[in-house]
């Protein structure tokens, strides 16, 4: 009996065992069985598990905010990029959060990092440790929605980490004269004490201003202040601190370690004697605030202050911090941590990594009074630290030279709000180690004497003007913890930033110079910012290739003026006509597309419009063009015009436009709605003969360049472009919008619906949804008409997409929908993004990057994961019992590494230097054309197959399902581990990669065996090829 071809074979049926099927009845399963199922598939911690995870020597990243590229892009796309953004108002350093998230969404990670470091020289540190829930995130407008606020800290960390991986140095402000040509004031000696966040920030901004003799004196043999010594490695790795210090040193700032501010060493008086013109005090609060009950207790007995304990942990866990490798403190048994601030929680989670079996965090007040940010408290809770509120320490019990317990009394708050201690309620808590985290003070008399003659306030801290950070001595400034205004790293950074401007103002005044009334601190610059992105086309010089399309962003010339002020290189006017052809628009007329599904807000992948050309007169446009050219002579203004098929009309309007001073004309032969009914726009642009004649008429009428704007709504766009060239056009715009009907409501009425009758017409679809059509049009024209200028438009929403069009053969890029999604300031992102893309092409060490995207390392939730298969020769998913096995294997490996006691290698920063010429815009135009051809030119011998990275796989089975129901049934799906496996029947179709939610979890690799298609029935004849 012949096999039934339309039924799956037995081996395929086996593969399909877990493939979804339409439900035909309710499912029955006992509660006890479901509990077992739940346990097997559980990814989050079991609420019934009370054991601490073994964390000894595990200093891997534990932050919930950390993001990989996939997570960063999704989160950045979700951001609303609000007007007058509240998040920015809540940031102590006033980061332009809206703009840097815009850059991340556009895959311009350099642009995002530049924006961050411009306002915060410690942008990566703050991205990792900022209490964002109390700052920027607390003001996020998405708090008013179901999905909640944006993970701003994670996005900031991601962008700056990518920039760190680029290994590109900071440079002086390119607009400054060389150091030797700066005025004498910029050679003034400036000293800073303490190499912590406040001083690093202050020194960075002073160096950016142009000061060349800046020295930081640091008491310790390491730099970074509390960022190095007291914030644990699992929250802030030392290589991050070192990276930001190296950026500062790129500008010539010097650091001298082993030099302290003390009456026995360096004082303000001796500093002045040595010719220093200004000083900044950023020494933090160096001494612990120690309760009297701890007097006489030592570390050997089991007592530490946070000022003792955290630096010891840092030295034992932070590679590169010190020249030597110190062991971690040996903590065993039960640990009591006293305090309720961020430092107390850092002590608690660090104690677990030093071997503590159990940690109690004890504090005087209640949970609602905890000063630590929720992020820190949540991490300690997840790691099974215990919280004991309403307890005040009374006595430490020592036996046999070791701490064995502590006594506490209960605290209560009375009706007046005062806290009282009840001596009748005693609590006895056994412990092996006690860590006091009651804050820090400035109490060393030698340090205070060294600061003489500055005044101190009632808290024993330097008295400063909170606006200028100036002390009672005009030449001395202070900031950070030592002043008492800053409570966080980012606030210390801002203290240094604030002080830098007023130090600048003070120093200049000493040399008889003045500064601007409004503070103007320089931005962050690197060699990327020096890349030239100007381009010449049709004899016109464009300062950059980005311009406004003839569309809604050019509704008025005042809008074009604002666009030029923002940085756009050129603009087309909204298409205008002779007065006899003037139009009046309908409303509603511009709507969001349906191509993004139920996604509302910015980032729409398409819009549909039934808007006609400009309602303004030709006289308005011509006068305005004259004004724009007078005020912006370096910007290109192109007048977009439209007439019916009438030589006299085209001649008249073209001459008027030329006389206005326009650099060039665009002939709109492509408006897909409304104008065609009037014999204009599309009515002219679909016929090569009409296009050829119109171009001839205009060529005869004007001397300036002109470009025909083509419609994609034709069978062969090349024939239209060729006709335009034959008619004398200097180039073409490709393409206008695609004619479409965006959607119908459930009652059959359209949207947009005009008037009571709810009528509509086919409109023009724009946005990224039409990019594939536009790319095809541009490449087709560029291949057929080599060297013929093309102004690309159609889905350009970033530097990355703009580069695609340049590679396709376009010379300049018109933008509309992206501005509708955002605003004119996206131009800054586009320019920095394009500069970065060009610059990175010259760095040999980054050739495995895709644009600004680094090569993907195996990760889960954005954090690198160890390859379990390499540790135990077995593949394990990350859920249920397998997750517990993974944790156990990782814990054992961490202990093994600790026992090996391998010395830390010193950190070395090697900046990448271009080894190839940095390409210009001209160099990249048409680069992709060599790869395009006919299907017959493609090799059917060089086949690929899919390869899955099991460590990155999240076991969703999307690859399995699409392969089953849309492909070749070539993926097996394990019923217990949900690990997919590619079989040898894979045809390399790439559907699995296309639907996989994890970037680079699936890769296509070369097939190692010959590919033999399954024909179903043997061929009756031999194939021709």
UniProtKB/Swiss-Prot annotation:
Binding site for substrate: 609, 668-670, 736-737
EC annotation from Swiss-Prot or TrEMBL: 1.3.1.2
Annotated residues for binding of NADP(+): 340-343, 364-365, 371, 437-439, 481-487
Residue numbers binding [4Fe-4S] cluster 4: 986, 989, 992, 996
Residue sites binding FAD per the record: 129, 194-198, 218-226, 235, 261, 480-489
Family annotation (CDD domains): DHPD_FMN (cd02940)
Reactions this protein catalyses: 5,6-dihydrouracil + NADP(+) = uracil + NADPH + H(+); 5,6-dihydrothymine + NADP(+) = thymine + NADPH + H(+)
Subcellular compartments: Cytoplasm
Pathway involvement of the protein, from the record: Amino-acid biosynthesis; beta-alanine biosynthesis
List of residues binding [4Fe-4S] cluster 1: 79, 82, 87, 140
Major enzyme class: oxidoreductase
Cofactor detail note: Binds 2 FAD.
Illness: Dihydropyrimidine dehydrogenase deficiency: A metabolic disorder with large phenotypic variability, ranging from no symptoms to a convulsive disorder with motor and intellectual disability. It is characterized by persistent urinary excretion of excessive amounts of uracil, thymine and 5-hydroxymethyluracil. Patients suffering from this disease show a severe reaction to the anticancer drug 5-fluorouracil.
Family: Belongs to the dihydropyrimidine dehydrogenase family.
Quaternary assembly: Homodimer.
Name of the protein described by the UniProt record: Dihydropyrimidine dehydrogenase [NADP(+)]
């Amino acid at each position: 009996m012949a096999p039934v071809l339309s039924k799956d074979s037995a081996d395929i049926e086996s593969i399909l065992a877990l493939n979804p099927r339409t439900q035909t009845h309710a499912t029955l399963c006992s509660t006890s069985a479901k509990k077992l199922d739940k346990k097997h598939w559980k990814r989050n911690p079991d609420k019934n598990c009370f054991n601490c995870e073994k964390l000894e020597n595990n200093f891997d990243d534990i932050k919930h905010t950390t993001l990989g590229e996939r997570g960063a892009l999704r989160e950045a796309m979700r951001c609303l990029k609000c007007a007058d953004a509240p998040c920015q108002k809540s940031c102590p350093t006033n980061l332009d959060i809206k703009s840097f998230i815009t850059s991340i969404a556009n895959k311009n990670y350099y642009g995002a990092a530049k924006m961050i470091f411009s306002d915060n020289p410690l942008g990566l540190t703050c991205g990792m440790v900022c209490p964002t829930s109390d700052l920027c995130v607390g003001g996020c407008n998405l708090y008013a929605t179901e999905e909640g606020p944006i993970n701003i800290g994670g996005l900031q960390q991601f962008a700056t980490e990518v920039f760190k991986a680029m290994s590109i140095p900071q440079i002086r402000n390119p607009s400054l004269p060389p150091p030797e040509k700066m005025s004498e004031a910029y050679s003034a000696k400036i000293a800073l004490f303490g190499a912590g966040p406040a001083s690093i920030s202050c020194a960075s901004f002073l160096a950016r201003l142009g000061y060349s003799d800046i020295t930081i004196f640091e008491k310790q043999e390491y730099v970074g202040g509390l960022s190095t010594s007291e914030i644990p490695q699992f929250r802030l790795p030392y290589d991050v601190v070192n990276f930001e210090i190296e950026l500062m040193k790129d500008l010539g700032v010097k650091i001298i370690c082993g030099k302290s501010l003390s009456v026995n060493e360096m004082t303000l008086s001796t500093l002045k004697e040595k010719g220093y013109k200004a000083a900044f005090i950023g020494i933090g609060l160096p001494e612990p605030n120690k309760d009297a009950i701890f007097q006489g207790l030592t570390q050997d007995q089991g007592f530490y202050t946070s000022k003792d304990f955290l630096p010891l942990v840092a030295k034992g866990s932070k590679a590169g911090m010190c020249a030597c490798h110190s062991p971690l403190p040996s903590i065993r048994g039960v640990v009591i941590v006293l305090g309720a601030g961020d430092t107390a929680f850092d002590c608690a989670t660090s104690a677990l990594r030093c071997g503590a079996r159990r940690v109690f965090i004890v504090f005087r007040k209640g949970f609602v009074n905890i000063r630590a940010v929720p992020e820190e408290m949540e991490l300690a809770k997840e790691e099974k630290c215990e919280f004991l509120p309403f307890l005040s320490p009374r006595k430490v019990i020592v036996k046999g030279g070791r701490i064995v317990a502590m006594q506490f009394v209960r605290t209560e708050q009375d009706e007046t709000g005062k806290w009282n201690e009840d001596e009748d309620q005693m609590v006895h808590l056994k412990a092996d180690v006690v860590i006091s985290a009651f804050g820090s003070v400035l109490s060393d008399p030698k340090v205070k004497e060294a600061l003489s003659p500055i005044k101190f306030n009632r808290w024993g801290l330097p008295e400063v003007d909170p606006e200028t950070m100036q002390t009672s001595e005009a030449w001395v400034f202070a900031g950070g913890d030592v002043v008492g205004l800053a409570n966080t790293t980012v606030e210390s950074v801002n203290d240094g930033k604030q002080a830098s401007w007023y130090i600048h103002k003070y120093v200049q005044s000493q040399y008889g110079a003045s500064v601007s009334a409004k503070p103007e601190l320089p931005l962050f610059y690197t060699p990327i910012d020096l890349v030239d992105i100007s381009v010449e086309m049709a004899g016109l010089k464009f300062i950059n290739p980005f311009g406004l399309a003839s569309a809604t962003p050019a509704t008025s010339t005042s809008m074009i003026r604002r666009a030029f002020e923002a940085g756009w290189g050129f603009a087309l006017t909204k298409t205008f006509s002779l007065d006899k052809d003037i139009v009046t628009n309908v409303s509603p007329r511009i709507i969001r597309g349906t191509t993004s599904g139920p996604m509302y807000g910015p980032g729409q992948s398409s819009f549909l419009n039934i808007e006609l050309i400009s309602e303004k007169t030709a006289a308005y446009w011509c006068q305005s063009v004259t004004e724009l050219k007078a005020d912006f002579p370096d910007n290109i203004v192109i007048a977009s015009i439209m007439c019916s098929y009438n030589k006299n009309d085209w001649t008249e309007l073209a001459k008027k436009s030329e006389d206005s001073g326009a650099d060039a004309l665009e002939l709109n032969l492509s408006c897909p709605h409304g104008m065609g009914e009037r014999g204009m726009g599309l009515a002219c642009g679909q016929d090569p003969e009409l296009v050829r004649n119109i171009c001839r008429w205009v060529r005869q009428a004007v001397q300036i360049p002109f470009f025909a704007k083509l419609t994609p709504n034709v069978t062969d766009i090349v024939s239209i472009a060729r006709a335009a060239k034959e008619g004398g056009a200097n180039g073409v715009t490709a393409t206008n919008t695609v004619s479409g009907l965006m959607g119908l409501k459930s009652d059959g009425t359209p949207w947009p619906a005009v008037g009571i009758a709810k009528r509509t017409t086919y409109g023009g679809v724009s946005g990224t949804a039409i990019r594939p059509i536009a790319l095809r049009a541009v490449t087709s024209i560029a291949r057929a008409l080599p060297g013929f200028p093309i102004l690309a438009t159609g889905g350009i929403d970033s530097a990355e997409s703009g580069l695609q069009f340049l590679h396709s053969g376009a010379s300049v890029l018109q933008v509309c929908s992206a501005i509708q999604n955002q605003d004119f300031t996206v131009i800054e992102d586009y320019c920095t993004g394009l500069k970065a893309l060009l610059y990175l092409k010259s760095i040999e060490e980054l050739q495995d990057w895709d644009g600004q995207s680094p090569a993907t390392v195996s990760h889960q939730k954005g954090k690198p994961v160890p390859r379990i298969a390499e540790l135990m020769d077995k593949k394990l998913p990350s859920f249920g019992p397998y997750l517990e096995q993974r944790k156990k294997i990782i814990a054992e490996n961490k202990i093994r590494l600790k026992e090996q006691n391998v010395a830390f290698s010193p950190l070395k920063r090697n900046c990448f230097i271009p080894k190839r010429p940095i390409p210009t815009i001209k160099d990249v135009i048409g680069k992709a054309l060599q790869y395009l051809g006919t299907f017959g030119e493609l090799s059917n011998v060089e086949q690929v197959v899919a390869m899955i990275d099991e460590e990155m796989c999240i076991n969703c089975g999307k690859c399995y399902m699409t392969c089953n129901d849309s492909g070749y049934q070539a993926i097996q799906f394990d019923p217990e581990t949900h690990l997919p496996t590619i079989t040898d029947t894979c045809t390399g179709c790439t559907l699995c990669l296309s639907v996989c939610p994890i970037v680079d979890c699936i890769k296509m690799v070369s097939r190692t065996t010959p590919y033999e298609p399954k024909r179903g029935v043997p061929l009756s004849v031999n194939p021709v090829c």
